[in-house]
């Protein structure tokens, strides 16, 4: 599998391209240097289909996102972001201090930039929301706005 960032596509050399083209309408088979190659749009939803078929398809965030803020993700954060941007539903039950906040914000920022999401709702204790989430958004994502809503129930 070859990632083609300029074309926003994945190139696959397959024995049975119909396996992919039957599930991904935009997938096209063409010949390159005498070899049939299947070109698939590199988007979160097509990545999920390829993974469900058993391919080790990378998330498009790795080739198309400029990591916001002064940090680049650690390996575990990179894996978390990969999963969050491809799977429509995901729980992150990692331990404290493993970078869940930044991973979530990077995922949201990427999905927002490609038009997949418009808003996010973060539900957590008020103390965590103000200190952790607020500071991370302010420091690493100056392009994002946030509001804190709280109540007695």
Q: Can you say where each PLM-predicted feature lies in the sequence?
A:
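A short, exposed loop/beta-hairpin motif centered on an aromatic-Gly-Thr core
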Residues: 37-40
């Amino acid at each position: 599998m070859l990632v083609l960032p300029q074309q926003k596509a994945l190139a696959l050399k397959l024995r049975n391209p119909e396996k992919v083209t039957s599930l991904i309408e935009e997938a096209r088979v063409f010949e390159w240097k005498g070899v049939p190659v299947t070109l698939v749009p590199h988007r979160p939803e097509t990545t999920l289909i390829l993974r469900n078929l058993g391919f080790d398809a990378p998330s498009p965030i790795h080739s198309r996102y400029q990591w916001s803020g002064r940090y680049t993700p650690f390996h575990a954060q990179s894996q978390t972001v990969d999963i969050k941007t491809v799977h429509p539903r995901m729980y992150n039950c990692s331990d404290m201090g493993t970078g869940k906040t930044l991973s979530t914000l990077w995922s949201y920022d990427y999905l927002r930039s490609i038009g997949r999401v418009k808003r996010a709702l973060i539900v957590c204790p008020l103390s965590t929301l103000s200190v952790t989430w607020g500071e991370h958004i302010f420091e690493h994502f100056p392009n994002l706005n946030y509001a804190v809503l709280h109540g007695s129930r």
